[in-house]
């Protein structure tokens, strides 16, 4: 059994709000889960059709906005940092790098982002962070993913974009043009029961014992094994990963910029594959072609991995 994950859930839950937004000609729809820690958003594309913005895209836009404002206001003094989980898009690291902001990687789960904030408290300034699963946090006063402050900030981003003659969707396209195109896709392979748990264990063992040499037609250039805390390059050189503890996660990076993260779920009988492929987008109107090319890459990756 395969499913796409949280994106499908938010698509269903946002449908009533989107229908109302169409009636009142709204610019933005936001929805949180019952405990108000995650937030999903939708906005109109260039054709006026409502589209769901995924967690990676939301994180990109809100961090892009925060860093832009920090830079314009002269608030970047040195020592500022952001945090993302290891399965979140690498594109936000490019945004941070261009603005001379340190971007830290941590394990999935906001306790790890909160840990990085605590470790640097009084020495560095946390600006923002997030994860692909629709969790975001700006500033450091909550120490957990928080849909309330995230909704306020997303609304501010949308208002800022509108003041500059753009929609939220057009802002997203501008980010892709400036930093490169990225498409993310999560596959959840469900393996129920005791036999399923054994099968998932065997899959992870096989990935470690027989790492792929190429994925989707591109050579694997780097492997990160968070269970052994080892980083292996294409020449077989091994170095240590700087992480607080081990975790049953594997990551493969290819020459063309593709990133694949594999990990068993800690709460459900499934193994998760996080796929991120890269491309170029020369202009905002090039989105359709860039997305189509990225979709081909995603399918090639899935075929290589047999998922």
Where are these regions (language model features)?
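Phosphate-binding and adjacent anionic-ligand microenvironments
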Residues: 22, 26-28, 32, 49-51, ...
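Short Gly/Thr/Asp-enriched flexible loops that form oxyanion-binding sites at enzyme active sites
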Residues: 37-55, 92
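Short, well-structured alpha-helical segments in soluble
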Residues: 14-24
